[in-house]
């Protein structure tokens, strides 16, 4: 979905909304974090609670290890380092996952979030596979890329990302009916030329509007 369409396409249900933005980028001053901040600013303008989970700043370990496997098999409790993150995810009404595209997919840190945090017994039920703690939430995947959205769509990469992340992972397994993928595209890394900066600022304005629109939708 185009950013402008996403802003106008949002509807809402009516109480205090909790928006959690989750980022994967080692640079604190990156465009990734600027996008997350813009989204939260928009959400807070509609009186929502907006918080940031920077996976790098939190010291998150993305590597799926033996403890994770033992928990998956039902032989051990959830690893201690996941408890607070899962609590924050469970309490959120809206999850915004913000990350740059690396080799046509999410970075390793964000993949580790999927592997370890959205696990069996939390995101879906052991045995039955039924959705659990994410069911009914709103999810927005915001992907940053130097390419254009039109290229992602024409190449088939967009369809693959939507199928894998929005439809299969969040829709089928996690019970999230409202999951969408949005692009902050045509970015030029490390370039301070006025035209490029203006284009980036324009995208941030749209992201701020998106954050507000998502909250308004849930408040209707």
Describe each model-derived feature in a short phrase:
Residues 2-122, 126, 194-197, 201-220:
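N-terminal beta1-alpha1-beta2 submodule of the flavodoxin-like/Rossmannoid cofactor-binding fold
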Residues 125-173:
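Short, glycine-/small-residue-rich phosphate/pyrophosphate-handling segment
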Residues 91-92, 98, 137, 169-178:
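A structural motif corresponding to the C-terminal end of an alpha-helix
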Residues 16-20, 144-147, 184-193:
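A short small-residue
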Residues 156-220:
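Glycine-rich phosphate/pyrophosphate-binding loop and the adjoining helix
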Residues 59-63, 148-150, 189-191:
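A short beta-to-alpha transition loop/helix N-cap that caps and shapes the active-site region
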């Amino acid at each position: 979905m185009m950013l402008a369409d996403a802003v106008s396409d949002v509807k809402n249900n009516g109480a205090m909304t909790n928006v959690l933005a989750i980022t994967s980028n080692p640079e604190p001053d990156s465009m990734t974090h600027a996008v997350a901040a813009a989204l939260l600013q928009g959400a807070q303008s509609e009186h929502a609670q907006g918080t940031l989970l920077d996976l790098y700043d939190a010291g998150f370990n993305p590597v799926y290890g033996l403890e994770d496997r033992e928990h998956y098999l039902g032989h051990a409790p959830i690893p201690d380092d996941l408890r607070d993150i899962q609590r924050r995810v469970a309490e959120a009404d809206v999850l915004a996952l913000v990350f740059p595209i690396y080799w046509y997919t999410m970075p390793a840190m964000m993949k580790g979030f999927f592997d370890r945090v959205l696990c069996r017994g939390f995101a879906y039920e052991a045995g039955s596979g039924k959705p659990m703690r994410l069911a009914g939430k709103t999810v927005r995947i915001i992907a940053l890329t130097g390419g254009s959205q039109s290229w992602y769509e024409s190449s088939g990469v967009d369809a693959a990302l939507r199928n894998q992340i929005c439809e299969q992972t969040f829709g089928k397994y996690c019970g999230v009916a409202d999951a969408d993928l949005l692009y902050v595209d045509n970015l030029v890394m490390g370039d301070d030329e006025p035209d490029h900066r203006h284009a980036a600022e324009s995208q941030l304005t749209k992201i701020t509007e998106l954050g507000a629109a998502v909250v308004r939708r849930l408040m209707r």
